[in-house]
A protein has these predicted regions:
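Bacterial N-terminal signal peptides
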Residues: 8-20
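Bacterial N-terminal signal peptides that target proteins for export
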Residues: 1-9
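Periodic aromatic/glycine/histidine/acidic cluster detector
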Residues: 23-119, 124-144, 148-167, 172-214, ...
Length: 245
């Protein structure tokens, strides 16, 4: 019995040594631009990983603090030297140096899938982008650092289709566009005081409508009228409100 126990223990210890050798930990270093570097003074990130059966189990850290830059993830071994790796499946979660979440995105069959979200270091959301099988699909948004929405755009089949709205940092409207396959067909814009700057329709790349300029006191400065992409009339006013020839 004692002899059997000793043999069993030896087998377990040997298996442990073999496993450690098989799954030996490695490191690869990146500079602040995400490029691999062997110059330690320029290292900004370090990736620690093991490889088993062609799959790398990895986690990224800020260097030299070793604060986590990512949660653990798995990628094909050939992706291990790519700073932003493409996962076969699962979530990639990144963190700011101060511990605030930076990004969460999910892969399915090596393609972005579902809602990807980014945050500023202050914890406020910076962007949201929906994906379906690697293509932009749905409504994406961007935000200012103060949390106010900067823009919102509709995607279909990986192109802008639908509305595209933009706002100033105080939340007042800046621009509204109607998009068809990444091209605007209607544009309406305002200045920071809420005055209309342009009201344009576009067909086959040709503009129709008006473009306005304003003085700081709210008086109209100029008005340009376009038809079939040709400027057909432009009127200027001075600060007193008189037409300038």
């Amino acid at each position: 019995m004692i002899q059997y126990w000793r043999k069993s223990l030896a087998a377990v210890l040997l298996l442990g040594v073999f496993s450690q050798t098989w799954a030996q930990s490695h490191s690869v270093y990146f500079n602040q631009h995400g490029k691999i570097t062997a110059t330690m003074s320029s290292v900004a990130y370090v990736r620690q990983y093991t490889v088993q059966s062609g799959i790398a189990k990895a986690q990224d850290f800020y260097y030299p603090s070793m604060k986590k830059y990512s949660d653990p993830y798995e990628v094909p071994a050939e992706q291990i030297k790519v700073f932003v790796p493409v996962l076969d499946n699962g979530a990639l979660t990144l963190w700011h140096f101060n511990g605030q979440k930076k990004m969460v995105g999910t892969y399915k069959n090596s393609k972005p899938n579902g809602e990807w979200t980014n945050w500023y270091p202050n914890g406020k959301k910076s962007a949201v982008m929906p994906y379906q099988n690697g293509l932009s699909e749905g409504t994406g948004s961007r935000y200012y650092r103060n949390g106010v929405k900067e823009s919102e755009i509709q995607f279909k089949h990986d192109k802008a289709n639908g509305y595209w709205k933009q706002w100033y940092p105080d939340g007042s409207p800046k621009m509204e566009m109607n998009m068809v396959n990444d091209k605007p067909t209607e544009i309406l814009s305002w200045d920071e005081n809420g005055r209309i700057l342009s009201e344009i329709s576009i067909s086959n790349g040709r503009r129709n409508g008006i473009v306005l300029e304003w003085y700081e006191d709210g008086a109209k400065k100029s008005e340009s009228v376009y038809s079939n992409d040709q400027l057909v009339k432009k009127t200027h006013w001075d600060k007193e409100g008189y037409v300038v020839e």
